[in-house]
Amino acid sequence: MTINVGVLAPKSSWHFRDLKRASESFGDLKVCSVDFASLSAAVGLGSCERFHDSSQAIDKLDALVVRTMPFGSLQQIIFRMDVLHRIRDAGVQIFNPPRSVEIAIDKYLSLSLMAANAIPIPPFAVVQTVSQAVATFEKLGGDVVLKPIFGSMGKNIHRLTDEKAARDRFEEFVANGEVLYLQKFIDHDGSDVRVLIIGSETFAMRRVNEAGGWLTNVAQGSKAESYTPTQSEIDLARSAAQTNHCEIAGVDLVYPCDAVEPLVLEVNASPGWQAIQNVCERDVAKSVLQFIAATMAG
């Protein structure tokens, strides 16, 4: 019996093409692209609720991989997540489950849950007004990282060390309708560790800012290096992934200069693997599909 797997990613994207390539070694697994932006639901027009994108019936798939979550309005994002929940209720297996995507995409919820489960994270606060942000800036030592509460790849992240410059940035965020996620800056050696978890498998890389800066995202120009994680790093990453209800997760760890144990910076429920696959020389896409096939087989 063929397993039909939909991937929420454009056909032109590297990750979809890599999954398509890997699927060719499976005789009983087919991969197709699903368009997040055209997902639709129809109720009362047949015997049951039906789900489509612009080209196919989604409820006819066996599994769905959430590879990307495109930006959109509040209505669009809520509807897309609601549809994922209903597609899952209709019997389509979703990787990662919708609830894990909801948790991990929200830095406040994700990190507060990890803190509640004794997972070490940087001190942070989330506020809604400029005056609260200025007070928090001072409480966190006058050296903070301001991030979008929903965001990825190091975009729109600012390190703030001057109160006037910080206030100006806070006013900009508030004017744009954003809440203010303020994390205490963690001094480190310009590198961090990404641990990629796919079921029982683990992959890892070290990301290095060769220019000596503090941002380590590969998307922002840092270099990926091969890395063998310690068992304690793997255990910490797995605990973080489980707290976020993730079966597939990218977990970022950073070592403060004044500590020997790492902190969890964040958990990504739809992690990319292009950089990590290049440096670890393992077929990550094949592992993703093997995990899906094994899960579907029970």
Predicted regions and their residues:
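Glycine-rich phosphate/pyrophosphate-binding beta-alpha loops
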Residues: 268-281
